[in-house]
């Protein structure tokens, strides 16, 4: 029964064909029963909603829109600052604890942490004592740095029985931490290589009581341990050290007397400076010292091998040469002869250089002539062996080279040379200008002569008038 009545239940909405008016007509049954050909109710409702939305939009977009009407500004009265501040929603209904209670809770936590800490053992056999006291003689640990056992026990008893925060006068609440000493290497001399490394302990610069003390300890640490001043004085190349040794050598040489013929004092000064260089050089000190020892041994052996009689003979000859009188005229004559010999030698050397250059030039010309003759002979032989096509190609290359030379000559003529007619015209123009200049000069002289007579007469008249006045 339901299936038979189902086609009658489907209705169809039909719009009127009247233009500009959207109304609904009467209901109309489907022509074909049993087939769902009527419009869907959902589509009809969507169309109705769309039309209604268009009508509303048309109404609010015109002059009847209340948002487009004139709205005078509202006067908002604020009796105190932040009166209309937006109120934030509270996360929970629980209120904040008072500040006094928070402070008491923090103090209770700190008190519990400090007074329940374990006290380290002070026995000398413990690892902590050996770490804090690397050397018994250099240790600065005092009894005040640690809490005494009796004081700790009394503090615990007081904490159990009495109120917190009160105790005997010897009881301390907190430990005073002391920074350990630093173990640094002792400086050694450059020559002492085989000795064992030595260390010493210095106090840390962070252990100062005030900032000024820490700064002074830091400067002393830089000077004694880091030794930065040595890095500033000595560079990597060693130029400053070399300049210092050179300055010392010059000062020592100026102090000694140069009158003695035997320069043993100078050798002594050189030896001392060389020994200073060996001691100051950290890398090559040992090597330089070995070289110095070998040289001194060689000199000692050489001096011992020479007999004393030969020394005395040489010394006598030196004294005789020093006491021999020498005339000034002989010295001047010898000096003049030496100058003449030097001049002749220079002239001979210049002549030798000139002849050598001429010889090299002749050899080069001879070599070029020989090569030219060989090339011409080879060229003739090659031409006889060439085929007709190769000869044509060769002539073509020669013609092209000649054509390039002709083009270069034409370019040079256009850029550098001048036509003969132009040069003749220029010469004639120069001659005419010179002739005009001569004419103008002649006319100028004639005019000067003509003006000279009246000018003298005028000057005489002026003199007469002056005398009359």
From Swiss-Prot:
<dbReference type="Pfam" id="PF15739">
    <property type="entry name" value="TSNAXIP1_N"/>
</dbReference>
<feature type="coiled-coil region">
    <location>
        <begin position="346"/>
        <end position="375"/>
    </location>
</feature>
<protein>
    <recommendedName>
        <fullName>Uncharacterized protein C6orf118</fullName>
    </recommendedName>
</protein>
<dbReference type="InterPro" id="IPR032755">
    <property type="entry name" value="TSNAXIP1_N"/>
</dbReference>
<keyword id="KW-0175">Coiled coil</keyword>
<feature type="coiled-coil region">
    <location>
        <begin position="423"/>
        <end position="453"/>
    </location>
</feature>
<feature type="region of interest" description="Disordered">
    <location>
        <begin position="152"/>
        <end position="174"/>
    </location>
</feature>
<feature type="compositionally biased region" description="Basic and acidic residues">
    <location>
        <begin position="152"/>
        <end position="161"/>
    </location>
</feature>
